[in-house]
Design a protein with these regions (language model features):
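Pyridoxal 5′-phosphate
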Residues: 1-292
């Protein structure tokens, strides 16, 4: 099962594997506007059947910037004997992640987004009882190694060919360095950025005349707002939305503006990091007002 807020590349991978093995992908329609997280829980759990084998769940959705109730979903789904693949591309650095407590079957997340590590740095976690089932895309020397499950897992995934491991090696230092920028460490960073995203979303919604898409409890360092139908829409022949181009060219603002076909909704998504301040969202709101 795949919620329709899933990142398209991951969704495509699920579709590809399902087609190869004759499986069926069940897409769960979750609205763009959510009143409470229980809506999501109910929609996903209702879609599960006795034939369900795997659920792709996000920590925070990339297209729509919504914090999924992933902790509850992992517990509820896996208690039904179904494995969860937790997509934490937007996870490290914006939500607390406790691998032991989550006990999720599979989890992968990027570090270059919110931990400020080099591109190509990420992590893959596979629960101990699932390690022997998973192989890397490239089969190399580790495949024939006579090792225990953990050693074989590391050998197979660490050595898939000639590569530069520098981005991976930067992760521990980046976590420590960024966490030392404020006295409260990472808990303070997460809460500070969340409050800033909520503040920015409020200004953005006021400028656009739209309603918040989720309650504040479902906001992390990402937040999205629907764009009024009054604003000039993207020409299908153009690669970028005209509002995105205008904000970048005329105001020096880089912010995603998308039309999400699964909701037939056009929206804008902001992010809030330690280097951002309230004045930047005020500037964005004014730019949006001028663009109406």
């Amino acid at each position: 099962i795949v919620p329709n807020h899933a990142y398209q590349a991951c969704w495509n991978a699920i579709e590809f594997i399902a087609k190869r093995w004759g499986a069926k992908v069940i897409v769960i329609d979750i609205p763009f506007i959510i009143e409470e997280e229980d809506q999501i829980i109910e929609l996903i759990l209702t879609a599960i059947t006795e034939r369900t084998k795997l659920a792709l769940i996000d920590t925070v959705t990339s297209p729509t910037g919504m914090r999924m109730p992933f902790e509850r979903l992992v517990t509820e789904i896996q208690n039904r004997g179904i494995d969860v693949l937790l997509d934490a591309a937007h996870g490290p650095g914006i939500v607390p992640l406790n691998l032991e407590k989550l006990d999720v079957a599979y989890m992968t997340g990027n570090c270059h987004k919110w931990l400020c590590t080099p591109k190509g740095s990420a992590f893959l976690h596979i629960r101990e009882d699932r390690k022997s089932l998973i192989k890397p895309l490239n089969i190399s020397h580790g495949y024939s190694a006579d090792l225990n499950a953990q050693e074989k897992f590391r050998f197979e995934f660490d050595w898939t060919g000639t590569q530069d491991p520098t981005p991976w090696l930067c992760i521990p230092k980046a976590i420590g360095s960024l966490g030392s920028k404020v006295t409260g460490g990472w808990p303070e960073i997460l809460e500070r950025n969340r409050k800033l995203a909520i503040y920015g979303r409020k200004l953005m919604c006021e400028a656009l005349g739209s309603e918040p898409s989720t309650p504040e409890s479902m906001v992390t360092s990402l937040a999205a707002a629907e764009i009024s139908s009054k604003m000039k829409k993207k020409d299908e022949n153009l690669q970028y939305d005209p509002l995105h181009t205008s904000l970048f060219d005329d105001y020096g603002i880089q912010i995603p503006v998308w039309h999400w076909p699964h909701h037939n909704t056009r929206y804008i998504r902001l992010s809030a990091a330690l280097y951002n301040g309230e004045e930047e969202y005020q500037y964005l709101a004014q730019a949006l007002t001028d663009s109406l």
